[in-house]
Amino acid sequence: MKILVTGAKGFVGRNLCSQLNNIKTGKAKCYGDLQIDEVFEYDLDSTMEQLDAWCSECDFVFNLAGVNRPQNPEEFMTGNFGFASTLLDTLKKHGNKAPVMLSSSAQASLTGRFGNSEYGRSKKAGEDLFLQYGEENGVKVLVYRFPNLYGKWCRPNYNSAIATFCNNIANELPITVNDPKVELEVLYIDDLVEEMIAALKGQEHHCEFEGLTVLPSAEGRYCYCPVTHKATLGEIVDLLHQFHDMPKTLMIPEIPADSFAKRLYSTYLSYLPKDKAIFDLKMNCDDRGSFTELVHTLNCGQVSINISKPGITKGQHWHHTKWEQFIVVSGHGLIQQRKEGTDEDVRDFCRNKISRYKIPKYIFFVDEFPMTGSGKIQKFRLKDLGLKLCKEQGIEII
């Protein structure tokens, strides 16, 4: 299958082309038997000769090209309607009946605050043109009205509030929120890309629109992405400030699986400058060794690193309503538990395997763990180095 993507260097186009090329090269293996042979990437630096050639060969078209922030309103119609006409005329010239997807906007509803939107009018004109083209030529046309988009590679200070907030907060720049109670419906770029690939496989989601409201319908003229989220500006900014403060608080906010918070955190990280990808941790040192907190959580306690010098015994205490788990990753020593109130029931644990020790209401002792290094402990936003340490020390992993 050969795919033509117009607007390939824009926010949506770049993300879509990246995944399409992953499928083409076999890096993305989660789409069944979908096979992509070529991805034609058309943008402002492409030629009309290239467009003509690609329109003659392609098996599917993603039309993402458009104008969002022109210098004058007339450019909306030229950029959004004019190019659409050129694209469809070129496909028609070659008799190419490949399915065509159109990227439109919620503003094309021309309702509510979008009633006088020049951008919305140009998008609505493009929709009508595509739908008419489909009816007249027997071509499958997929018109998507996207809400507010966000995700990696989205340009800040352009047309995405989330991109601007992420960029400014990550880079210590001020932000402006006129009304924190304003609610946005937002669509994450990876969810959009998944829907585009579903459309490529003939599994798109159809609907009708009642104003801005999506009405799912198998026979609907329009299409939509089924996974969106709603959040107020205040909620978005509050989450971003929590992400920003993590190096100081070490507190990981609640990030449920498949949540808006998870998507927003991934987006925020993509705007971090290089010098913030790593940060120092506070290393509490004394004659016994050191203790360093790594992360705190709201519901699951904290994670820390404890380094003991040779011959040192730590512990010798117990908790009423707290439990601890120890994972020994380097060195050697003896961990013991004794049942409170008796000298009996002393438990020894294996010394030469990577193990996890659960500590209930027992006194525990930790002996003979040597120092593994010196200087500041730093936390990386990378995978854990434990496996590397194991291999270097010849420690068996169980």
Task: Please report, for each region that a protein language model flagged, where it lies by residue.
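Mid/C-terminal beta-alpha module of Rossmann-like enzyme folds, strongest
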Residues: 198-283
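Conserved C-terminal "lid"/linker of ANL adenylate-forming enzymes
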Residues: 346-398
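Conserved Rossmann-fold NAD(P)-dependent oxidoreductase catalytic core, especially the SDR/UDP-sugar
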Residues: 85-127, 134-137, 141-142
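Conserved beta-loop-beta element that borders a ligand/cofactor-binding pocket
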Residues: 128-153, 173-182, 217
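NAD(P)H-binding glycine-rich loop region in Rossmannoid oxidoreductase-like domains
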Residues: 43-86, 90-94, 107-114
